[in-house]
């Protein structure tokens, strides 16, 4: 299943995780970008708007946020949220980030670029993100969030151990997958130093990286919502309902057996300034 297909299938589950995971990181990213009234913001891999909606509130009625993603079902949730919040300065657009161009309404380039938990899903992280950075005006701000090294690791190991009981050779390419683990792009940006170096190589200066500590209680409801509402869901795409239910039950049992009481969702929040 494609990345867009995986996330389209998770729209309601994805958003159920927002208050505990995507939301805190998105709010932190919008704050770290020091957005100002009237700014034009490009939010990439926007999902249901975890970082785009706080950005829209920050830039006010004279600003604009273009929130793009390949998963239109997720974007529709964001549109509903924006309408409910009376935010008229945000457009949720189903579009490919690798092809997005600055519209005529933003003639001087974006004032800020944000991407929360999305850079490792880009088809070529280095080339694709460098291109997006060039859509920002010189002196504009660039910000990303990524999992910190070790985050979600114990959770993911337990999940894939259970999945392997039913499909030892299942392929899954999410950022916490074991397939091609050492070559996954996230390996190059999961520490403060490596993330800062990477942003500098992408055309940013004055890079700052902060750690957002987030440990979510591993309740039965949350752990399964997190599986279904994230890239982990892709590993379940070939299983029927009865097998999925068995995996859910055994996964919960294994978390208890291993003493995993919290899900470590610690995140790195990085910002920089686009160089001339």
Where are these regions (language model features)?
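Class I SAM-dependent methyltransferase SAM/SAH-binding core
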Residues: 40-102
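Conserved hydrophobic residues forming the short capping helix/wall of the S-adenosyl-L-methionine
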Residues: 59, 82, 163, 199, ...
